Amino acid sequence: MKAIIAMAQNRVIGKKNGLPWPSIKEDFKWFKEFTMGKTLIVGKNTFDTLPLLKNRECLVLTKQVEAIDAYITNQYLVNNNAMTGQMITMEDIESYSQFRKDYLIVVGGAKTYVKLLPYITEFYVTHVNGNYDGDTFMPEFEHLFAHQEVVKEFDGHKVVKYSK
């Protein structure tokens, strides 16, 4: 499976359930292009902050099914290995990723990235130019990937593809 993230030089990825840096229009455009038509895996806190993502299916990882069950429509809910209306496990996600690896993308937050890091074969990281104050950080992961390649550059920021 793949993952996509934006990260400041000091590894900050969030602040108060949002992005700590000013809006980067080109990065939002890149995110939309990269995720369009795909199945996204997202943690509940991150899911709560996202706008409606048209033409994308979401698998929401949470321990609090009742907190979001009421307003999920046309989305699947993964609740500690149980999907609403259907059982699903982390093994199911791993199996699903083997068959649909080009269609399954982890989009955050930090706990979700860490939990699914063993399954991620390609990690697309927008390296945001600068250091920012934040309360959510991405731990080091680069050592898990053998290759890295700059795939996009805009406004002083670089998108690097890390692959195994």
Where are these predicted regions, by residue range?
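Enzymes that bind and transform nitrogen-containing heteroaromatic metabolites
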Residues: 1-164
